[in-house]
Regions:
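Acidic (Asp/Glu-rich) catalytic motifs at the cytosolic membrane interface
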Residues: 41-60, 80-93, 199, 203-206, ...
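Short hydrophobic/aromatic-rich motifs at helix boundaries and adjacent loops
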Residues: 52-57, 142-143, 168-170, 222-226
């Protein structure tokens, strides 16, 4: 079995720093612990993304055991995996009906929205807005779609959320047993997701031609590390 040792080492390091942010750093500074926890939460989400594509073992099933519990508490790993892989299988990127990761709406649906909702979505379509309110907007929209699937009898989605509740409860139990206050961890989760919104905001802008919806993100430094240097997104 092929093992990508640098990636595996990064996974171990991510959990080690996350643990330090919970059990050690709050004794020095809660603000510092929140900042470090937020960075590790963002990094963990990037690692989950890598696992969906078969890293670090060359087979997704083994890698999933390392990242099944979502540290940001927002999205079940199973649902992230399924929708993300469906997104990559779709040639019509940004299509609001075909692309499960699209941030766009059908014009006919848009004109039927209340004015206040249009304002919120327009704000969400700026980088500052995506970082500030994007975690809430995307969570509400995603959970509404998921609830619809569950009501329609999708047992796979229901199982994914049931497992997510159990695993998230486990994460929160670890947080509750740590030095970091639970409220501080929830803030760290929000910041971590907000950081991820920087990348997803840049990916797949609407364009008349499909090839115009693929991006190359030129970046260096901390953000490049948190996004694991995945500069090409197709």
């Amino acid at each position: 079995m092929r093992v990508e040792w640098p990636t595996l080492a990064l996974i171990i390091l991510c959990y080690a720093v996350w643990g330090a942010a919970l059990f050690i750093l709050p004794g020095l500074s809660v603000l510092l612990s929140v900042a470090i926890a937020a960075l590790t939460i963002a990094l963990h989400s990037s690692i989950q993304h890598e696992v969906t594509h078969g890293h670090p073992f060359g087979t997704r099933r083994i890698g999933e055991w390392l990242v099944f519990a979502t540290l940001n508490l927002s999205i079940p790993y199973i649902r992230f995996r399924d929708t993300h892989l469906a997104h990559h299988m779709d040639a019509r990127l940004t299509d609001p009906y075909e692309d499960p990761e699209s941030n766009y709406l059908d014009p006919e649906l848009w004109v039927c929205l209340p004015r206040w909702m249009q304002v919120v979505l327009n704000i969400n379509n700026t980088l500052a807005g995506r970082m500030a309110i994007g975690p809430i907007v995307s969570q509400i929209a995603f959970m509404a779609d998921e609830a619809r699937l569950i009501r329609n009898g999708d047992k796979h989605v229901a199982f994914a959320w049931a497992l997510h509740v159990v695993l998230s409860a486990g994460v929160l139990m670890v947080v509750a047993a740590s030095v970091m206050p639970v409220w501080a961890y929830l803030i760290a989760c929000y910041i971590g997701i907000s950081i991820l919104k920087i990348r997803t905001f840049l990916e797949h802008q609407a364009h008349e031609r499909a090839r115009g919806r693929t991006v190359i993100i030129e970046d260096r430094g901390l953000l490049a590390f948190l996004f694991l240097n995945n500069n090409l997104h197709v």
